[in-house]
């Protein structure tokens, strides 16, 4: 099994180009079911993207892959969808597989999707997905680990209030509503930029969507959607990760190819810690200037601080001057990186959904194990900060969400290699 070997103590200096957003491209790929052909550019080279390709092919899609140095182009032909079951063997690898449920159901009137997998960071039930589709007229039962959904005729527009903010359920509802009969109004929607990107793609395909980027989205269903080409936005989670990498290594890095407005909340949190963050053309520059203050953090739905960056921020706070409180409000099991950070000398105590982090002068290298995607990269950041050797095991998680991570870090002076 592969592992990463990191020799830390080297400040990162240089430029890092940000890849396409995983959390945007996956629902856009699922949206290809709603039309006959979709051309997607700026697609990151990730195993989750490969899993979604496998899933779409299992439904009968034909996918042409055009490979470039830093990205893929995908041409997805879905005119011959002939299988409406998303099997466990594919779905277990990635929770985003559930996003084929809405498109299959709204276009073909039936779908059978295995209950999803992905990182083991909490229950993340599918109740809201099912509730909104039932409100649109679907008949849904859960049998033998599968969601069996059907509708007599087209789904019907509805007014639906999400009782909690859910990125996944908001996406499935939008994907279903664009071909439903009549008007759908969704309340308490998630606001993530990746949802905005999906809506922009669907609008370009001919969907009628109002309220994009707000908590109230109105969709007037169409009979069909058009073929088109769309460029996926850049990955704010990847950008934030490298911003923290620059800070924890006392470096100076330009993060390129990302709109500042979607990472502004990350930048403001870093500025609180004493790190210099300056917008530049098509990106941001992060510079350590000798100070790293302890700052409290709470994860919340966007525009709050992303749960996908909580572990990385915690790594940074292990070296801060003082005590910080990190509160995880999204997932109930997202502190699995804490024992591994403590193996490296961090002083962290977890109490329920809160972690108290007391800054130490220095972390030390150790053999550590990744438990999930974001935890794995937090341990890399910790390893980069040490003056010794860190070995990270179970790095297959990384390839689900970070393209060319070792290359991007090495180009900025890091000593990191995969063996």
From Swiss-Prot:
The active site is at 119 (proton donor). Phosphoenolpyruvate binds at residues 22-23. Pfam families: EPSP_synthase. InterPro entries: Enolpyruvate_Tfrase_dom (IPR001986), Enolpyruvate_Tfrase_sf (IPR036968), MurA_subfamily (IPR050068), RNA3'P_cycl/enolpyr_Trfase_a/b (IPR013792), UDP_GlcNAc_COvinyl_MurA (IPR005750). Keywords: Cell cycle, Cell division, Cell shape, Cell wall biogenesis/degradation, Cytoplasm, Peptidoglycan synthesis, Pyruvate, Transferase. GO terms for cellular component: cytoplasm. One of its GO terms (molecular function) is UDP-N-acetylglucosamine 1-carboxyvinyltransferase activity. It catalyses: phosphoenolpyruvate + UDP-N-acetyl-alpha-D-glucosamine = UDP-N-acetyl-3-O-(1-carboxyvinyl)-alpha-D-glucosamine + phosphate. Its main location: cytoplasm. GO terms for biological process: cell division; cell wall organization; peptidoglycan biosynthetic process; regulation of cell shape; UDP-N-acetylgalactosamine biosynthetic process. The keyword Translocase does not apply. It is an enzyme of class 2 (transferase). Pathway: Cell wall biogenesis; peptidoglycan biosynthesis. Its EC number is 2.5.1.7. It is found in: Cytoplasm. It comes from the Bacteria. Cell wall formation. Adds enolpyruvyl to UDP-N-acetylglucosamine. NCBIfam families: murA, PRK09369.1. Belongs to the EPSP synthase family. MurA subfamily. This is UDP-N-acetylglucosamine 1-carboxyvinyltransferase. It comes from Rickettsia akari (strain Hartford). The lineage of its organism: Bacteria, Pseudomonadati, Pseudomonadota, Alphaproteobacteria, Rickettsiales.
